Amino acid sequence: MLTDGIRMGRFSMIGNERLLTNGWQILKFSECIKQLNTGLNPRNHFSLGHGSLKYITAKNLTQFGTIDFSKCDFIDEQAKRIIHRRSDIQVGDILFSSRAPIGHCHLICEKPDDYDIGESIFSIRVDRKIILPDYLCLYMASDYFVRMASLHTTGSIIQEIRISDLMDTDVILPPMNEQRRIAECFKKIDRKIALNNKINDNL
């Protein structure tokens, strides 16, 4: 059973007074992380279409927390080194789409040796003394967080969220043991979905 303030599959604000009891608190996004980087766009830095490594942009992050590698461009080793100096992506980082649809994110669980990211993706490294990456990734995919973040989007054609506005967005933060419970509940759901998909693929 998920905690108060959380509905199965989605987070939902019930009221600050209730959420702020029993160790719950509200922090600014900037207080929960150690660093936020972006990837790099080609421009004069490198070119796409060469090599076998994958170049990930906002369109490749799905609503299910996965990366769709079937629709990505390709880069070579040199381009990846150039991008990585800026992105510095590693296991435990959260990839977050800064462009609409806001809220598509992915938690890196395996070494990202065969891909790197463009400027439309933020790479977020949490402060693990404060928040678990699993919890923050789930929270950033929630309807509540997406609504709050979308209040600050800019652009009439392609909506984007600026780093400064993201940093100022509220994060509802339960105690660490509650974060673990929430994350584990969703992991069990994800494992069940993955198993069902595997069974369906073999039918």
Predicted regions and their residues:
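Ligand-binding loop in jelly-roll beta-barrel domains
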Residues: 111, 125-132
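Sequence-specific dsDNA recognition surfaces
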Residues: 27-46, 59-91
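A structural connector/turn signal
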Residues: 83-84, 110, 156
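Non-catalytic DNA-recognition/assembly elements of restriction-modification systems
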Residues: 2-40, 168, 172-202
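Well-ordered mid-protein domain cores that form the structural environment of catalytic cofactors
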Residues: 141-144, 150, 170-172
